């Protein structure tokens, strides 16, 4: 018996060549909803920590909206007036842009993107998310957000069944 050799017939090779693009497309489209679902759960967890009752009242540092954006962060992603941070639809759109920027920064720096690390960056900045010893308050926030995101994801899966 010979090990390590492959006997690929021309017919099998053609079938694999034909199927490969379809399999790749199936993989990519299956991964996209999972990534969007994780993003949704993470952002919803952040919202629940930041402003669970959707109050329009500014935070102690002038933060506004569901995600308690500071004006400088808001202006990184939109030219819309900062007051629109209290509009959940507008705030959600900006939150997605901020999430994607944080995700890209973490990936660029070689870090795995997880709900914990996104929340750590959201609360303490990218520097906190890549630091060896981030502030305990930021770690606590990130742990709470990651736990909430995991719970939201479990509930979403349970409803889907």
Residues covered by each model-derived region:
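N-terminal targeting signals for Sec/Tat export/insertion, comprising classic cleavable signal peptides
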Residues: 44-72
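Bacterial N-terminal signal peptides that target proteins for export
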Residues: 3-20
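Catalytic and substrate-binding regions of cell-wall glycan-acting enzymes that process beta-1,4-linked
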Residues: 113-161
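Short, functionally critical alpha-helical segments immediately adjacent to catalytic or ligand/cofactor-binding
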Residues: 38-54, 95-96, 118-126
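Alpha-helical segment that forms one wall of the substrate-binding/catalytic cleft
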Residues: 71, 75-130
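Extracytoplasmic
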Residues: 38-43, 61-64, 113-115
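Sec/Tat signal peptide C-region and signal peptidase I cleavage site
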Residues: 32-36
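Bacterial N-terminal signal peptides
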Residues: 19-30
């Amino acid at each position: 018996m010979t090990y390590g050799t492959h006997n690929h017939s021309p017919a099998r090779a053609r079938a694999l060549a034909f199927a490969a693009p379809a399999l790749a497309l199936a993989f990519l489209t299956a991964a996209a909803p999972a990534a969007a679902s994780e993003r949704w759960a993470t952002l919803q967890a952040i919202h629940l920590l930041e402003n669970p009752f959707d109050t329009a009242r500014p935070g102690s540092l002038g933060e506004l909206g569901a995600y308690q954006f500071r004006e400088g962060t808001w202006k990184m992603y939109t030219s819309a007036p900062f007051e629109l941070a209290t509009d959940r639809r507008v705030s959600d759109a900006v939150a997605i842009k901020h999430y994607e920027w944080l995700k890209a920064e973490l990936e660029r720096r070689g870090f795995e993107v997880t709900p914990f690390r996104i929340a750590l960056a959201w609360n303490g900045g990218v520097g906190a998310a890549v630091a060896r010893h981030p502030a305990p308050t930021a770690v606590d926030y990130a742990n709470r957000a990651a736990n909430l995101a995991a719970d939201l994801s479990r509930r979403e899966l349970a409803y889907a069944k």
